Amino acid sequence: MQEIKMKTLSAGIIFMTEDKDLFMGRVTGSRKTGMMAHRWDIPKGRVENSDLSALDAARRECLEETGFSNYNPDLLEDLGVFKYSSNKDLQLFYYTIPVEHEMFRNCRCESYFENKDGVMIPEMDAFALIPRTQWQYVMGPSLYRIMNNLF
């Protein structure tokens, strides 16, 4: 009998300025040898059994990965569920009010993982508002495909 693998669902929030610069975090340790850029990502993560909804998961992940909570969750628009990879879908929520640089001044990642040397390090180690023209260089291909189609 063939085993059926269930797709996991991740959820994330898209925050943009009026000029469509996207709030992103730099993924710690993501710069590969010989590559110029680190990988950057939006605040997102797996929807856990303890989450009440995908929106709840997106808000939790945003807080864990960025420490950012200075927004009105009632202004998050559900953009839907997108195929992220063969084993993962991504549900995205868009903050409908443009954000400002100053809003992210005190961001800090509180979500840690153990690196190959056994040291606990934050998932994200820097934050920035990334212009649309740079997305293809800093995003992973799955996120870029989705964001390019949306915006």
Swiss-Prot record:
SUPFAM superfamilies in the cross-refs: Nudix
Boundaries of every Nudix hydrolase domain copy: 6-143
Xref: InterPro entries: NUDIX_hydrolase-like_dom_sf (IPR015797), NUDIX_hydrolase_dom (IPR000086)
Cited Pfam families: NUDIX
Protein name per its UniProtKB record: Uncharacterized 17.7 kDa protein in e-segB intergenic region
Species whose genome carries this gene: Enterobacteria phage T4 (Bacteriophage T4)
